[in-house]
UniProtKB/Swiss-Prot annotation:
GO terms for molecular function: GTP binding; GTPase activity; magnesium ion binding. The gene is obg. Coiled coil: none annotated. This is GTPase Obg. It is an enzyme of class 3 (hydrolase). It comes from Frankia alni (strain DSM 45986 / CECT 9034 / ACN14a). GTP binds at residues 166-173, 191-195, 213-216, 284-287, 313-315. Belongs to the TRAFAC class OBG-HflX-like GTPase superfamily. OBG GTPase family. Monomer. Its EC number is 3.6.5.-. Its cofactor is Mg(2+). Residues 160-332 form the OBG-type G domain. Its main location: cytoplasm. Residues 63-86, 456-544 are annotated as: Disordered.
């Protein structure tokens, strides 16, 4: 079972937002309580945080799927749902986050560095938040927005001060074991080390420094031979490169100078930046017969190249102390010369005044609408609710989508795609269309509403044509149907029952009927009185 993993594929899923609640307040003696549906909670984020106690990506190797909790739905009585908890994933220092296409998202260096890998979805608004002067009691609520889904590649680049590089079996693991308290696996066969071994070394009064034992490199490592690419990335962050050369090798065609040239060529081929790193040379295994003589022979050539050379023996610890002091001094000098890490600046870029909220482009035989607002509105719309669909249509119309579609020549019935939803577009006609007849919220022509009964104007005209000698006792009929036609011009999905503009409560209907009966009785009394006066007057004239 692996104990060190430096590359994994992580499938992150943020929490979905909670749905809003569509609820009406119910309380004794309050028949028109109004909407009281609460908002849904926000979905949890998936966050990566650098933890110094974590040194490997092993946990994600066994658990590659990570999901944050979703937001709770809203409830009645204006109770909002709880937000989902963020999922905190600890990662080692030096973790690089990449997309599936290899694009780098973030380089996490330093304890506490954090990155939001996937953001949770917004919670849907309840009908209490959707109420307005025109829509006083919405019978719908917004759905929670889905959380983000992301497949990311996590790569660990070891953060160390010193990198020990060289051919397999050059003695790198043995050297790191005597420089520090690390206990790597040591054997007499190539590629014993398959993962970097880290150790913390101390020398004199200098601060401690970190040493990384990089697995062995061979010719073609920069092209991936011998897992070269997996090993070379652990050198990128090291500030000092130490070439460990085997002076006791018996392989034909190999000697310390040749090995140095091969490793230098692979480093330069992998990254040009590595060619500029400070470096020194360690001639290892001088305890082996004839190895010390070979070390003395090549030392002059190495120093002629401007390299510091140290001859050591990991077995007898000869020269190890001097090497450790030199490494500590070099690391301290490099740390002092390194520029301080600047704090990340948060740049706020204001949105342009004339920047459109959406774009409409031709897409096959239809049109494609892109934009954060319309796509979010579609995701949060409950398409099983007619009022919610009408609300979406109103929002798109106010945003100017209909005007843009009409400008581009869209006709009724053409397919329009917004996000993952495709529908047939039916233009909403304003007043004056269809010969002056506007459309109500449900698509019915306003002039057809109440056409079976005369309105107030028709009743007044009819009353004027009656005989002036016969008074009209009944008052003008309330234009209830006309009011209904006017109210239907409001946005689709408005609740006329609670608005009080169209439908009357039982008490109001009874009061109106009572007033009508009283008016009829008064009119009958006036008619009887006028008839009696006429009869009396006629008798007087006859007597006269």
């Amino acid at each position: 079972m692996p104990t060190f993993v430096d590359r994994v594929v992580l499938h992150a899923a943020a929490g979905d937002g909670g749905h809003g609640c569509a609820s009406i307040h119910r309380e004794k003696f309050k028949p028109l309580g109004g909407p009281d549906g609460g908002d849904g909670g926000r979905g949890g984020d998936v966050r990566l945080v650098v933890d110094p106690s974590v040194t490997t990506l092993l946990d994600f190797h066994f658990h590659p799927h990570q999901r944050a909790s979703r937001g709770r739905p809203g409830q009645g009585s204006n109770r909002s749902g709880a937000d989902g908890e963020d999922l905190i994933l600890p990662v080692p220092d030096g973790t690089v986050v990449l997309t599936g296409d290899g694009e780098q998202l973030i380089d996490l260096v330093g304890a506490g560095s954090a990155f939001v890998l996937a953001r949770g979805g917004r919670g849907g608004r309840g009908n209490a938040a959707l109420a307005s002067a025109r829509r006083k009691a919405p019978g719908f609520a917004e759905l929670g927005e889905p959380g983000e889904l992301l497949d990311a590649v996590l790569e660990l680049k070891t953060v160390a001060d010193v990198a020990l590089v060289g051919f397999p079996s050059a003695g790198k693991s043995s050297l790191v074991s005597v420089l520090s308290a690390a206990k790597p696996k040591i054997a007499d066969y190539p590629f014993t080390t398959l993962v970097p071994n880290l150790g913390v070394a101390r020398a004199g009064d200098h601060p401690p420094y970190t040493v990384a034992d990089v697995p062995g490199l061979i010719p073609g490592a920069s092209e991936g031979r011998g897992l070269g690419l997996e090993f070379l990335r652990h050198i990128e962050r090291c500030s000092l490169i130490v070439h460990v050369l085997d002076c006791a090798t018996l392989e034909p065609g190999r000697d310390p100078l040749t090995d140095l040239d091969v490793i230098e060529a692979e480093l330069a081929a992998y990254s040009a930046d590595l060619s500029d790193r400070p470096r020194l040379v360690v001639l290892n295994k001088i305890d082996v017969p004839d190895a010390a003589d070979l070390a003395d022979l090549v030392t002059a050539d190495l120093r002629a190249r401007g390299l510091d050379v140290f001859a050591v023996s990991s077995a007898t610890r000869r020269g190890v102390h001097a090497l450790s002091l030199a490494l500590a001094e070099r690391v301290a000098a490099l740390r002092a010369a390194a520029p301080s890490r600047a704090a990340t600046r948060v740049v706020l870029r204001p949105r342009a005044v004339n920047e459109p909220d959406f774009t409409v482009t031709s897409h096959g035989d239809g049109f494609l609408i892109s934009g954060a607002k319309p796509q979010r509105w579609v995701r949060q719309t409950d398409f099983t609710n007619d009022e919610a669909i009408g609300f979406l249509a109103d929002r798109l119309a106010r945003l100017g989508v209909e005007k843009e579609l009409a400008r581009l020549g869209a006709t009724a019935g053409v397919e329009v795609t917004i996000g993952d939803v495709t529908f047939e577009w039916e233009p909403t006609l304003s007043g004056g269309g269809l010969g002056g007849a506007g459309l109500a919220g449900d698509g019915t022509a306003v002039d057809l509403l109440g056409a079976d009964e005369p309105g107030a104007g028709a009743q007044a005209a009819a009353a004027g044509e009656r005989s002036p000698g016969v008074p009209t006792a009944a008052p003008p009929r309330p234009a209830g149907r006309a009011v209904a036609a006017t109210a239907s011009l409001g946005p689709r999905g408005s609740d006329d029952r609670l608005s009080g503009s169209v439908r009357l409560t039982r008490a109001e209907r009874m009061a109106r009927a009572r007033r009508a009966r009283l008016s009829d009785a008064d009119a009958d009394a006036d008619i009887d009185a006028s008839g009696a006066d006429a009869r009396t007057g006629g008798a007087v004239d006859a007597d006269a």
